[in-house]
């Protein structure tokens, strides 16, 4: 891409940055059901098998930070999980799924948590560099090669899913002291496996069949039948998602238990179960998205140039 096309691309993108969004194809869309009543957290295992399978699958993309790590200018801090790689109690750049253990009304619950893969992901809309995409199957993914780690995606996500690791990423080569802060990491629904018509690692590893992926219309039909006798979560939250939870316990009670468990404790990487509306419908987020649009256009154009140069080498 030459200089003229760069500016042309920027101008066109600026006009449509808030409206353009990658769409999953209806005939290829995948969704999942997580049956909380079936999950026992792999009580006899040293690590829940879905968590273990996820870590093994994604180990090749785990960050290897460069020392010393820069603080997030103008702040005097940075996020570093490189000494906590074995922490499976929450989402981190080295752990894309975890099991939330709760006791509600005398019943023990084990809830697999990871990215919900929203129908209209606010993280994608708010990203100032346009590096978050949605696959034909509906998987929401972050391009780790071009993410600056600004964490706007985490701010926009109702569940705070994406997690940041400092000391890695393109910002080290572009503006190590003035922009970014690393790379954001999260579950990508094993989109490479989905593209091959294979099942995600977490489903394959689950010994209780508590995790089930399938064609979206089929999964939603199952969920609609289940909600006649049980509670569901994820079908309407944040404007709709591709992850549906089913439980015999009311999700309002589950969310209350989560809030109580983490009261006065660090909540980074911990997902709640509130009935979230889509934050992009709120005026403050719409305003933020409008302000970010020109940046997204320039960022997307810049990344297109970098990719073009890289492809020519």
Question: Which sequence ranges carry the predicted segments?
Answer:
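Non-ligating segments of multi-cofactor redox enzymes
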Residues: 1-313
